[in-house]
Amino acid sequence: DLARDYEKKNLGYAPQSPLVIAVSNSGQVARVGEAVRRCRKAGAFTLGITGHEESVLGQSAERILKLDIPKFESAPGTRSYMVCVMALYLLAIRIGEVRGRYTMDVASARRKEIKALADALETALPAMDDTAFAVAQQWKDMDCYDFAGSGFEYACAFFGQAKVFEAIGRPAMYINTEEWLHLNFFVNHPEKIGTMIWAAEDNKADSRTLET
């Protein structure tokens, strides 16, 4: 817990170091504010990524990266999450660029890749929406839900669990794909559990995921 138990010796061991980045679109999460204030007091340099400069996070961090998310219909926090992740990607690209890890051309190409994702998503969404609706119709009365992923897909599993809590308040669990085989595989009445497994072809765990 960065707000309480994180070793102080790892904070402020050099002037304005390390860089501590806190992310909260609302900026009102109390523990995030506490963590930032503790890190800042210990000598770390703090950056808040938030949509509200006047929030707890906005007032606690030394610098703010302001998010501007257009208003849209109310829904579980998917857009805010995507914008926060995009901000972190862009920040990482910029840090690598100024540190000379790659050229300006490479940095520019990576930014364009991120921008192009919006067009790709717009193209894919209609079919995805139809599929998701069909699955939702089949799964609406499930007792609980499992979300399994490995590597970079593990975060997707975590996000899936969070959205089930937020949207419908049903029991859900996120788990590593390998661990699912050793634990959740033995749960009774699997027909009452909606199980979603991420299986990207470029994931190094792809072969094991297919076995699952």
Label for each model-derived stretch:
Residues 112, 116-119, 123-129:
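Ligand-binding beta-strand-loop-alpha-helix segment within the catalytic cores
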Residues 132, 136, 157-161, 210:
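A general structural signal for well-ordered alpha-helical packing
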Residues 124-141:
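A short, well-structured juxtamembrane/interface segment
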Residues 100-104, 131-132, 171:
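Short, structured loop/turn "capping" segments at alpha-beta junctions
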Residues 1-20, 140-190:
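Anionic-ligand anchoring segments at beta-strand to alpha-helix junctions in alpha/beta enzyme folds, i.e.
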Residues 1-116, 150, 190-212:
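Glycine-rich phosphate-binding loops that contact phosphosugars or nucleotide phosphates
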Residues 35, 117-120, 135, 160:
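A ubiquitous structural signal for well-ordered alpha-helices
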